[in-house]
Amino acid sequence: MSDSLLPCDGCGQLATDEHIAKRLARLEWMTRFRPVHISALLLSAISPGRDADFLYSPSGEFTGEAGRVLQAAGISRTEKSTEAILVEFQRRGLLLTHVLECPIESTQAKDSSALLKARFPATLARVRRSFRPKNVVPISDLLDPLLRTASGLVDTGCRIVLNGERAFSLNHHATSETISALRQALTASHVAVQS
């Protein structure tokens, strides 16, 4: 048997068995809370490195990206179980996904732009054919260079909701203004968001 690594289907990085197992676990966690009808698909660039920052993690820590997404959706975490929080997110027709479904391995960090560019067409196809949301809401500024073509915005098969002309930047440096703007955009997009 060969020890050669093959590219991961979810991110394009060379993948170990552990890498594949982690990707499949995260897909399973997300699929459990996938709405039947997706009002807004929140599209992030790169899956967080820590499970605590991954929205659908059963740990329910909701730090990092997960916490910012819940804050923007107006979902309180006070005195609620992890499942109750994720069910509320699901009932509102919200789904969070990533162009790169796996965290960037430290050895491949310099290639993140190339990996995003290579994986983006497959993500768009998945949005159009599988997710079929009413709205796509990009939530990472890393997606800005990928959202436009010579003829305009990329084809997602639905409306793209932007923060002006750019993606909402919910990366680690997100401001309260950005989170508030995203909440307003979700409300204006007729997604059930509570203040």
Predicted regions and their residues:
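A polyampholytic, Gly/Pro-enriched intrinsically disordered region
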Residues: 179-195
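Intrinsically disordered, charged low-complexity linkers and terminal tails
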Residues: 1, 166, 173, 191-195
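A polyanion-binding, active-site-adjacent surface
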Residues: 2-160, 165
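Short, charged, surface-exposed secondary-structure boundary motifs
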Residues: 169-180
